[in-house]
């Protein structure tokens, strides 16, 4: 199938965004006596999207007390409403030697998220690849390993219960196998069941890479979810990574990174149509919400990098089953794929890719405006779903309020003080 022209896939995505991510809100202004107030000036601006746009955050650059640290934190505050710890909640980070657990870095990052009204994903309870399993853990026998897993689950799940929007339970199972080989075919399902018992309210996710453009692996992913559910696992969502996004066909061509491309990256082209078709299939056959959990684009040309990231964001934001899109880092000095994956240069300035994403999040996909109430005391506007700051000015008084625009709340009353 030939890829769609950019103007076509983009216009179709934008139409879906307009339909799925925006709504009409009627603000009704009343005086302290309950009377409707006409000719009141109402200013409104979106403070926080309902949809989650986020990034992985790492403790070392976050805690930097110099200019680099300030730039790192400010870019996050300026652009995102969701975070995920890049490594700090992983078992190999919290319990390096099997003697004592350190949650201080993860606690600090979660506190930062909560202080700034950001959601936090939990990543990850376990990682199924042997190279990411601590030597002391890999050396345990089966019964000892099970006991260690139980202790890990009880410790970290209860510690963060009610404070996370999701947990990745066993990361990258399809290309892993450590826990499956050691614990048997029910091992991962047991992890899900135990995590759900310890924290019934936090959705539990699977999380895999190389799904887009790979029909065979998509089928394996669906088989995994079916098997987990058949074993009583409460799978609450599907995580989809995309680090090898240089495979995306943009403007009719694919531009693979010329050098330094990790061997685990695949090279099958991804068109806009196949991207949407994969999301359709994952959601259609499971009914589960989807989060684009780890997004990167590694190319030396920052403009082309921006083209690819914009395509991912626009397509993901336009799909009804996708609830979140998270970059896996952004800084030239800190990105795990190196400078060719950065949005922010070493001096803190946005490069062409960063400018593109910043424009989407702070200009194109935001809502701000003002107007006057009519004789019925009402002002109507259309905007993105989320939290708004509304300022109302009428003769002799001014009020600042927070309102939420949701599909279930198309109107809001605002009472002025005496």
Residue ranges and their predicted role:
Residues 364-376:
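Short, acidic Ser/Thr/Gly-rich low-complexity loop/linker segments typical of extracellular
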Residues 294, 300-301, 305-340:
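Substrate-binding cleft of secreted/luminal carbohydrate-active enzymes
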Residues 95-97, 101-105, 132-202, 206-223, ...:
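Active-site cleft segment of glycoside hydrolase catalytic domains centered on the general acid/base Glu
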Residues 26, 48-107, 112, 118-119, ...:
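N-terminal substrate-binding region of glycoside hydrolase catalytic domains
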Residues 52-54, 82-84, 117-121, 164-168, ...:
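Structural preference for beta-strand elements that scaffold enzyme active sites
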